[in-house]
Amino acid sequence: MFKHTRKLQYNAKPDRSDPIMARRLQESLGGQWGETTGMMSYLSQGWASTGAEKYKDLLLDTGTEEMAHVEMISTMIGYLLEDAPFGPEDLKRDPSLATTMAGMDPEHSLVHGLNASLNNPNGAAWNAGYVTSSGNLVADMRFNVVRESEARLQVSRLYSMTEDEGVRDMLKFLLARETQHQLQFMKAQEELEEKYGIIVPGDMKEIEHSEFSHVLMNFSDGDGSKAFEGQVAKDGEKFTYQENPEAMGGIPHIKPGDPRLHNHQG
């Protein structure tokens, strides 16, 4: 069950409207690593979790907080679009608005009535393919660290793209929360790795072709990666290096398709 409160988690009001910054913020809302991806990933992982209650609760806590971040960014975008120009009358009144109108996301006015959308800045819709919920919490926690890292990186870049103190205030809060989320997911990952092992999944090592499991194969014309040779991996084994990987699989010969498929291949 979710219960909404009308108060935002943190301030989300700019000093002035800025439709171009509104477009940029769409990446943190509807982009691959944005808050919608975090919200849906963590909630899905939490709902799928049947193990230790602390991990389930951690995921649901954080997924629900991401809802608040979606709300904050959507609100900020709405404020940034207040009084934004969108028609020829605006341009006639003030020709200097041409640059602003050229930099705006046309979908903000055309599709969403000068409101936020679940798209990235170029209008590509957010999609569920960005979400990870594998049922394996070691893998999922690793994804979560990456998601928070990418999100924080993008927020850092957005911070440098504006001098609006209201926008920056919200971004400072998001930076801090993404610090917390990185750290908590790293801690959960470490605990789960101690229990299940470093490699995901940890119960297949007995059947894999282990002679290939710690070989760094040189598939480029550089040799810089040879520096890893002899170093100890996190599982305690040493890396070896293969200068010239060999083709061991032979030449495939697949029979032609059924004539009804019309695969005319010469």
Swiss-Prot record:
Description of its domains: Each subunit is composed of three distinct structural regions: an N-terminal polypeptide, a central four-helix bundle that serves as the scaffolding for the catalytic active site, and a C-terminal tail.
EC number(s) on file: 1.11.1.6
Keywords: Calcium, Manganese, Metal-binding, Oxidoreductase, Peroxidase
Gene Ontology MF term list: catalase activity; metal ion binding
Top-level lineage group: Bacteria
InterPro entries with a match to the protein in the record: Ferritin-like (IPR012347), Ferritin-like_SF (IPR009078), Mn_catalase (IPR007760), Mn_catalase_C (IPR027407), Mn_catalase_dom (IPR039377)
Listed name of the protein: Manganese catalase
Ranges of biased composition (kind: Basic and acidic residues): 255-266
Binding site for Ca(2+): 57, 61, 218, 220, 222
Catalytic activity: 2 H2O2 = O2 + 2 H2O
UniProt-listed CDD domains: Mn_catalase
Cofactor(s) in the UniProt record: Ca(2+); Mn(2+)
Pfam families noted in UniProt: Mn_catalase
Species whose genome carries this gene: Lactiplantibacillus plantarum
Family according to the record: Belongs to the manganese catalase family.
Binding sites annotated in the UniProt record for Mn(2+) 2: 66, 148, 181
Subunit structure: Homohexamer.
